[in-house]
Amino acid sequence: MADKYKVVEIFKSISGESFHSGEVAVFVRLYGCNLRCKYGNNECDTPYSYEGNQYKLMTADEICDEVNKLSTNKFVVLTGGEPLIHPNIEFLLYEMAVLNHLKVDVETNGSVDIRSIVAKLMTIQNSSMLSENIIFTIDYKSPSCGMNSAMISDFAEMVDTINRCGFEVNVKCVITPTGEDIAAVKALVNRLDRISTLDTSQHLFISPVYGCDIAAIVDNMCKSELLSKCRLQLQIHKYIWDPEKRGV
């Protein structure tokens, strides 16, 4: 029997974050998350991805069929929730990237060891199409959201390993302008610079929490040699549409 995945929604919009911000994409949002982030009064912006059991069970074939109907550029964002906690997620990634030749940007929260996912992918087929067509955009959770302790303990080493395997890796630090958030990002940049092959100037992003003092974060970036290696990115979909609007 084919594996089935809990799908909350499939829709077409623009990628609002990270390296591929502004590109048209088909989003596949899977149900379930292992973290509960909260930034001050701001809860997770997609609580419906883990509350209420509002999802449809779909096979990889069914998901890819729906994506192919909507897509005009073969670019997919696999998001959640946390997509990598789904059992046998490697088979969905393989079907998308290899069998359907889709470019897949996997949005993951930094608490799941991607190295194990890559190892499972390689057991299906050690194909160059995997690294050519699968992107990992990894959130590094800052202290202010309460989930920093859930990050993989060797986060920088994990990023380096995946990058060395040939996959495009983007790291996104969602922060407020608090001192502890700024310090955490500085420590991460320093660690990545020392031990990894990741080009931080291209693939490390500072993403201000929607509604916070963005100017204060930019001021910190301008004053810090470490932070000035990062790129600022805004969740542009929240500025185009109502930030609570679904399906965009």
Please state what every model-predicted region is.
Residues 1:
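Short, Gly/Pro- and small/polar-rich lid/capping loops
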Residues 19-21:
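A short catalytic or substrate-binding loop motif that flags glycine-/basic-rich loops and adjacent residues
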Residues 5-15, 24-25, 35, 39-133:
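Conserved Radical SAM active-site core
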Residues 64, 84-247:
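Conserved AdoMet/S-adenosylmethionine-binding subsite of the radical SAM
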